[in-house]
Amino acid sequence: MPAIVIVGAQWGDEGKGKATDLLGGRVDYVVKPNGGNNAGHTVVVGGEKYELKLLPAGILSPNAVPIIGNGCVVNLEALFQEIDGLQARGADTSKLRVSANAHLVAPYHQVLDKVTERFLGKRAIGTTGRGIGPAYMDKVARLGIRVQDVFDESILRQKVEGSLHQKNEVLVKIYNRRSVVVDEIVEYFLSFAERLRPLVIDSTLVLNTALDEGKVVLMEGGQATFLDVDHGTYPFVTSSNPTAGGASVGSGIGPTRISRSIGIIKAYTTRVGAGPFPTELFDEMGVYLQKTGGEFGVNTGRPRRCGWYDAVLARHASRVNGFTDYFVTKLDVLTGIEQIPVCVAYDVDGVRHDEMPMTQTEFHHAKPIFEYFDGWTEDITGARTLADLPENARNYVLALEKLSGTRFSAIGVGPDRDQTIVVNDLIND
């Protein structure tokens, strides 16, 4: 059975957790292929809200095996805190597994993340301060510590010493901080070994064997397309590749085994942190979307920047990820707005751009060119088919589908799992 990948099509917080949760009851494995506890997502099940950070949303699907993939960076302390929090609420976390090849976030990564952001001042990226970027830097620099290293104290010590040799110089001489003691870091990691050991697997082997046996594997991408270190609005991006190609690398599932690439996209647009955002609203409408949509970060509580739907971004995201389907979320948030603008192109220094500008400078100068659609006042949270939607809401959805260039197979009309219009089956269609 081929694999399915879910990818955020904007700047994150699109509702990937809801999409994963909706499909979770029909899949056998849910793997998180990238990111760490910097990418929070909210899942509502039976009126209960769960805010997940490091764990895949599939942890709440009783039939699925949730896996933290090799492309992730894992803060072990945060991992077990999140597990304990779910268990305290009666959730079953016993099926959770972690790739032996996933990298670890060390306490010094978090220190470096925070002091670097402060040092940069106005040039700061706006990270969550959780050490994700520094952990990925170590991975690429071949100084990283992996999950499997926790079970070999000799290897662990060698790697910690190698990593701290340079970092202590930076902390002491540049940031005026105290040096980090090797023994403290080694003991920190070893303290998790006993509890971690039964969770660790060869995830590449497990997932590909599952596919060989006809099982359904869902890859749940973190962050989003325009936070991708290669395809995003660089340098205001994350440190990994949260696109469909990155899901393949971060799970060990080859690209030819992926049958569906599903983009998750809001009916409007949000962004957290610094970086360009052509359709951003700076008036009371932006505040309205923020409050009505509950647009506050799961991890940081920071208010999200809000703006109108951007079809240029949607087309580019579809191209980069090879989307077969879009899952649109939060259509209900737009209820009550008299006229809804949609960005269909950009004006860059007097020149119309129907597609994403090539350069960073051009994108910073991009101004949205809008088309306007009549809104609706009717409550749509009970709609379960397109025909149930008011005419104006239906027209809005169909217009977005045409402008975005990829079929809309599901539409979220509320936060709960069942508040979804399914147009096309996302697994078998």
UniProtKB/Swiss-Prot annotation:
Which residues are recorded as binding GTP? 12-18, 40-42, 304, 330-332, 412-414
Superkingdom, natural source: Bacteria
Task: Indicate which residues the UniProt annotation says bind substrate.
Answer: V298, N299, T300, G301, R302, P303, R304
Cofactor needs: Mg(2+)
Gene Ontology cellular component terms for the protein in this record: cytoplasm
Q: Which residues bind Mg(2+)?
A: D13, G40
CDD domains xrefs: AdSS
Which GO annotations describe the biological process of this protein?
Answer: 'de novo' AMP biosynthetic process; IMP metabolic process
Reaction(s) catalysed by this chain's protein: IMP + L-aspartate + GTP = N(6)-(1,2-dicarboxyethyl)-AMP + GDP + phosphate + 2 H(+)
Q: Name one GO molecular function term.
A: magnesium ion binding
Q: Does the keyword Disulfide bond apply?
A: no
> Might you give the EC number(s) for this enzyme?
6.3.4.4
Q: How is the cofactor bound?
A: Binds 1 Mg(2+) ion per subunit.
Pathway assignment:
Purine metabolism; AMP biosynthesis via de novo pathway; AMP from IMP: step 1/2
**Could you say which enzyme class this protein belongs to?**
ligase
Write the record's keywords in alphabetical order, separated by commas: Cytoplasm, GTP-binding, Ligase, Magnesium, Metal-binding, Nucleotide-binding, Purine biosynthesis
Q: Which Pfam families match?
A: Adenylsucc_synt
Q: Could you tell me where this protein is found in the cell?
A: Cytoplasm
Briefly state the protein's biological role. Answer: Plays an important role in the de novo pathway of purine nucleotide biosynthesis. Catalyzes the first committed step in the biosynthesis of AMP from IMP.
For this chain, the family text in UniProt reads: Belongs to the adenylosuccinate synthetase family.
HAMAP family from the UniProt entry: Adenylosucc_synth (MF_00011)
Name the chain's protein.
Adenylosuccinate synthetase
Name its species: Pseudarthrobacter chlorophenolicus (strain ATCC 700700 / DSM 12829 / CIP 107037 / JCM 12360 / KCTC 9906 / NCIMB 13794 / A6) (Arthrobacter chlorophenolicus)
